[in-house]
Amino acid sequence: MTTDEGAKNSRENPTATVAEQGEDVTSKKDRGVLKIVKRVGHGEETPMIGDKVYVHYNGKLSNGKKFDSSHDRNEPFVFSIGKGQVIKAWDIGVATMKKGEICHLLCKPEYAYGATGSLPKIPSNATLFFEIELLDFKGEDLLEDGGIIRRTKRRGEGYSNPNEGARVQIHLEGRCGGRVFDCRDVAFTVGEGEDHDIPIGIDKALEKMQREEQCILHLGPRYGFGEAGKPKFGIEPNAELIYEVTLKSFEKAKESWEMDTKEKLEQAAIVKEKGTLYFKGGKYVQAVIQYGKIVSWLEMEYGLSEKESKASESFLLAAFLNLAMCYLKLREYTKAVECCDKALGLDSANEKGLYRRGEAQLLMNEFESAKGDFEKVLEVNPQNKAARLQIFMCQKKAKEHNERDRRIYANMFKKFAEQDAKEEANKAMSKKTSEGVTNEKLAVSHAVEEEKPEGHV
């Protein structure tokens, strides 16, 4: 067969071509998924487990009959690699592709829809042919805020994950700007990585990993070393970091339901102290984790003795007030208000709770509500000079805000008035022009009438 004949045969019967020439991309090498690259992609990276991929495809039965196409819907198909969202052949085949690549896949039934099929379009035990174009892929957004992107190099074992307070052993390698700044084995408690110069993003990611999982983590500044940077490692403020992490082993911390009240109160005292140390060091996210443990342990605790109840209420009040302060520092004002509300639910006249809620509401431009809270602070403690100053700030900010609104609305109304005047002028001009044309036509008409002969032939 000549080259031209081979190309013609490939176009006319691509299924046969893949069957004859396709590369076996299965781990078992059982020829269950065969692949031919039709257009080479760019770069060296291929999708990893958990990556979100964007593809266009055409799907045909082995007889050439089309059963599905993303092109017909005019939108790419999106799925996550290795999560069982698509047939096995796709999880295997698409994971071998580079961005921009177009390939042909031939998929045996055991890697497609098997004996069940997918009626009415795909019969039982059907071998399927796909043409797939990999448009793009990106890592898994762990917290759905873009701050931690995970790309899984090796799947972990089992289904259990470390929890907050779990003892973990990991290997990590940290990079910044292509430079390796940290590489070691380390054991620590999840939520306390900062004590070992490990950024909070690693703690957060570990709660979603399985034993022996190996992944690459892209950390934004919020989940890295933040505004402070890390001089010890030569990390500048607000740096983007890349870590490769392997979770070697872990021992889970006790869950709330596994602890009795006495143990919860003992642990509350310990984590309160840890939270305060983190707060004083400017590690507000880490402090939130510690204070949050107190809430998770004690907020829904019932059947306590009078002594236990007083201790629990004291810990909860301190936790909510401290959480509010952390959220103020983190500029998460809505959460700060919520924590103050809970603190004031325990002690309605709490000076710190009222003041911090007022601060949060002032920063949210809720001037009247903020002023009301600061006035309540003065009712509790008339000597609170800071609250008196904040009332003045509320009045000043409210006045500035109202004046700014008036200017904005005045400018808007001025523009509307100018626009209306312009439209009226255009209408008047149009009317005048129209009347002029009409008068001119009438004059011409009269002139023609005057020139007409008196009689007809």
Swiss-Prot record:
PROSITE patterns in UniProt: FKBP_PPIASE, TPR, TPR_REGION
Origin: domain of life: Eukaryota
Notes on activation and inhibition: Inhibited by both FK506 and rapamycin.
GO term, biological process aspect, one: chaperone-mediated protein folding
Catalysed reactions listed for this entry: [protein]-peptidylproline (omega=180) = [protein]-peptidylproline (omega=0)
Signal peptide: none
Positions carrying Phosphoserine: 445
Disordered as annotated region, ranges: 1-27, 423-457
Listed GO MF terms: heat shock protein binding; peptidyl-prolyl cis-trans isomerase activity; protein-macromolecule adaptor activity
Positions annotated as TPR repeat: 268-301, 317-350, 351-384
A GO-annotated cellular component: nucleoplasm
Subcellular localization(s) per the UniProt record: Cytoplasm; Nucleus
SMART domains according to UniProt: TPR
PTM comment: Acetylation impairs ability to promote interaction between Akt/AKT1 and PHLPP1. Deacetylation by SIRT7 promotes interaction between Akt/AKT1 and PHLPP1, leading to suppress Akt/AKT1 activation. Ubiquitinated, leading to degradation in a proteasome-dependent manner. Deubiquitinated by USP49, leading to stabilization.
UniProt modified residues of type N6-acetyllysine: 28
Principal EC category: isomerase
EC annotation from Swiss-Prot or TrEMBL: 5.2.1.8
Biased composition (Basic and acidic residues): 1-11, 447-457
Residue stretches making up the PPIase FKBP-type domain: 50-138, 165-251
The entry's keywords: Acetylation, Chaperone, Cytoplasm, Isomerase, Nucleus, Phosphoprotein, Repeat, Rotamase, TPR repeat, Ubl conjugation
Note: The relative resistance of New World monkeys to glucocorticoids is associated with a high level of expression of FKBP5, but is also due to intrinsic differences between the human and the monkey proteins. Human FKBP5 has a much lower effect on glucocorticoid sensitivity.
Subunit text: Part of a heteromultimeric cytoplasmic complex with HSP90AA1, HSPA1A/HSPA1B and steroid receptors. Upon ligand binding dissociates from the complex and FKBP4 takes its place. Interacts with functionally mature heterooligomeric progesterone receptor complexes along with HSP90 and TEBP. Interacts with NR3C1. Interacts with Akt/AKT1 and PHLPP1; enhancing dephosphorylation and subsequent activation of Akt/AKT1. Interacts with IFI44L; this interaction modulates the kinase activity of IKBKB and IKBKE. Interacts with IKBKB and IKBKE.
Function: Immunophilin protein with PPIase and co-chaperone activities. Component of unligated steroid receptors heterocomplexes through interaction with heat-shock protein 90 (HSP90). Plays a role in the intracellular trafficking of heterooligomeric forms of steroid hormone receptors maintaining the complex into the cytoplasm when unliganded. Acts as a regulator of Akt/AKT1 activity by promoting the interaction between Akt/AKT1 and PHLPP1, thereby enhancing dephosphorylation and subsequent activation of Akt/AKT1.
Protein name as annotated: Peptidyl-prolyl cis-trans isomerase FKBP5
Organism: Aotus nancymaae
Encoding gene per record: FKBP5
